[in-house]
């Protein structure tokens, strides 16, 4: 608000207003360039193992970290800000299956977060509405990368026919869905990314991920 600039000189006021407008333009045109991960986020993005996890409570930033990481892998290197390029592991076309507990979570959390972060010019057609196929729940990027969205409510028998670079889970999936996802990235030497709040106590993820983990296979933050 400009009334908060009262007391500044005309020159200083103009500089602040110009900087604010420049920030607004950048937020609209290239929001990912304004994503600067905190220390734990930098550690998470730097993991290169076949399984990695961002675990934390509500508002801890785990969804932001995982979806930003998905975008880092999906975009062409030229479209990434320089401070995020060191975290790029895959080259386009990057094929990623993103899963959540329900379509409500996909629509209200995942889609919203991706729209906040993705530079519109990197999407097919230059905007979300053109790039997102509602019928197939697929997001298309201009460089050929794709995000395929499914939920844990979907029957396992309908999860076939996909071979990709990554499966990204928002909240802990049922074990059967995780096993299916793990199988789907094997052919392309892909990875799995988890973002979850440990609210159910010691579940399969403790026995299946934490307990037997090795530095070569799993890293969590």
Enumerate the predicted regions with their spans.
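Phosphate/NTP-binding elements of NTP-utilizing enzymes
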Residues: 1-221
């Amino acid at each position: 608000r400009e009334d908060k600039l009262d007391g500044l000189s005309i020159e200083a006021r103009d500089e602040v207003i110009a900087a604010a407008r420049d920030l607004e333009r950048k937020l609209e045109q290239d929001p990912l360039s304004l994503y600067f991960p905190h220390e734990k986020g930098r550690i998470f993005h730097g993991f290169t193992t076949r399984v990695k996890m961002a675990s934390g409570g509500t508002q801890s930033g785990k969804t932001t970290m995982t979806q930003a990481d998905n975008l880092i892998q999906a975009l062409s290197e030229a479209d990434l800000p320089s401070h995020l390029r060191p975290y790029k592991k895959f080259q386009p076309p990057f094929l990623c299956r993103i899963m959540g507990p329900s379509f409500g979570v996909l629509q209200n959390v995942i889609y919203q977060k991706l729209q906040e972060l993705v530079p519109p010019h990197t999407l097919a057609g230059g905007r979300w509405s053109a790039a997102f196929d509602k019928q197939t729940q697929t997001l298309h990027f201009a460089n050929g990368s794709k995000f395929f969205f499914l939920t844990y409510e979907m029957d396992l028998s309908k999860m076939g026919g996909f071979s990709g670079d990554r499966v990204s889970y928002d909240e802990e999936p049922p074990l059967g869905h995780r096993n299916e996802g793990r199988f789907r990235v094997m052919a392309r030497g892909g990875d799995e990314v988890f973002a979850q709040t440990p609210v159910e106590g010691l579940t399969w993820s403790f026995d299946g991920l934490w307990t037997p983990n090795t530095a070569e296979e799993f890293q969590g933050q």
